[in-house]
UniProtKB/Swiss-Prot annotation:
Name of the gene: tuf
Organism: Christiangramia forsetii (strain DSM 17595 / CGMCC 1.15422 / KT0803)
The protein's name in its UniProt record: Elongation factor Tu
Residues binding Mg(2+): T26
Region (G3): 81-84
Family membership: Belongs to the TRAFAC class translation factor GTPase superfamily. Classic translation factor GTPase family. EF-Tu/EF-1A subfamily.
Top-rank lineage group of the source organism: Bacteria
Coiled-coil region list: none
Assembly information from the UniProt record: Monomer.
């Protein structure tokens, strides 16, 4: 049977709901899918489908998160919702769910709470460019002045963390009301999505950068050759393009792309963000393995020394029970593989406690394909003890 093509007619964005526990993030996520389904754009996802978030492992860290998809008139969205606060912290630092923008949910009954602040700060640290606010549960607040006060507080908080608190949209509504089909509240969700469509800009996609895909798995298909699977990090893979395969400090291989597949469908091309299988001409399965990267020839250089912003897991999150000191030597899990490296702490920092967030310098024992913004996990004996991203390359 001929494979159908994947529809790319609407621009795609990754967003997520953030905010304090029990402020209505999951209810809002379900309400958006319902309202958009009623408008004829996509299918609904039920609350318990979203709330029953599966565990995922990203860079060895266990994260619970639910992914739903829906469309508006203008765009197609992949939306991530996390049940627990620690899941958000880990999700954002590891880049498990790369967000192009976020919907901050604040219950009008409570106003901004500690996690509201933490999520905004995290959004700033990991580079979420814009935030739209949904003031939830306004059906439970009779006092108009109280609503205005809460909105002012949220705007001040956004401005404090260098978001545009003055001009950013704040939509008031009731996620539960919309989920229950009350037209008055469904309209507020439509209004929210219009705000998301206009305020959250289409990111400058990584499509324009040079092609790079870390290899996750390798198969050989009888009669067709070797297929490498993975998520395209940057650029575009076209059938017929020449490529290089760069190993860990090893020599490089050259080949040509003979086909690209996604969701069991044939594509003319794969682009940044797509999970694809790439058919490689003249490459034996034994020559390539997980941890190598496929790139546009000459586009990536290997590096071993860099500065990074890191989060060290707490004991309760499965991290270390004790602090570590200068010259600590863990493994760095980068893209799809581990490399040993030595950590140098900033001047004046004697030790790092579980739960800390700081800037460190790292020197790896072998150079790997590296770029600024590259994310990694820090591991010790197969156990993840931290996560971070490269902020500056030093060699």
């Amino acid at each position: 049977m001929a494979k159908e093509k994947y529809d790319r007619s609407k621009p795609h964005l990754n967003i997520g709901t953030i905010g304090h526990v029990d402020h209505g993030k999951t209810t809002l996520t379900a309400a958006i899918t319902k309202v958009m389904a009623d408008a004829g754009y996509s299918e609904a996802s039920a609350f318990d489908q979203i709330d029953n978030a599966p565990e995922e492992k990203e860079r060895g860290i266990t994260i619970n998160s639910s992914h739903v998809e829906y469309s508006t008139e203008k765009r197609h969205y992949a939306h991530v919702d996390c049940p627990g606060h620690a899941d958000y912290v880990k999700n954002m630092v590891t880049g498990a769910a790369q967000m192009d923008g976020a919907i901050l949910v604040v219950a009008a009954t409570d106003g901004p709470m500690p996690q509201t602040r933490e999520h905004i700060l995290l959004g700033r640290q990991v580079g979420i460019p814009r935030i739209v606010v949904f003031l939830n549960k306004v059906d439970l607040v009779d006092d108009e002045e109280l609503l205005e006060l809460v909105e002012m507080e949220v705007r001040d908080l956004l401005s404090f963390y260098e978001y545009d608190g003055d001009n950013g949209p704040v939509i008031s509504g009731s996620a539960l009301g919309a989920l229950e089909g009350d037209e008055k509240w469904s309209k507020t969700v439509l209004e929210l999505m219009e705000a998301v469509d206009t305020w959250i800009e289409l990111p400058e996609r990584d499509v324009d950068k040079a092609f790079l895909m870390p290899i996750e798995d390798v198969f050989s298909i009888t009669g067709r050759g070797t297929v490498a699977t993975g998520r395209i990090e940057t650029g575009v893979a076209n059938t017929g393009d020449p490529i290089e395969i760069i190993g860990m400090g090893a020599g490089k291989l050259t080949s040509t792309i003979t086909g690209v597949e996604m969701f069991r469908k044939i594509l003319d091309r794969g682009e940044a963000g797509d999970n694809v299988g790439i058919l490689l001409r003249g490459i034996e399965k034994s020559q390539i393995s997980r941890g190598m990267v496929i790139t546009k020839p000459g586009s990536v250089t290997p590096h071993a020394k860099f500065k990074a912003e890191v989060y060290i897991l707490k004991k309760e999150e499965g991290g270390r029970h004790t602090p570590f000191h200068n010259n600590y030597r863990p493994q760095f899990y980068v893209r799809t593989t581990d490399v040993t490296g030595t950590i140098s702490l900033p001047d004046g920092v004697e030790m790092v406690m579980p739960g800390d967030n700081l800037t460190i310098t790292v020197e790896l024992i072998q150079a790997i394909a590296m770029n600024q913004g590259l994310r990694f996990a820090i591991r010790e004996g197969g156990r993840t003890v931290g996560a971070g991203q490269v902020t500056e390359i030093l060699d």
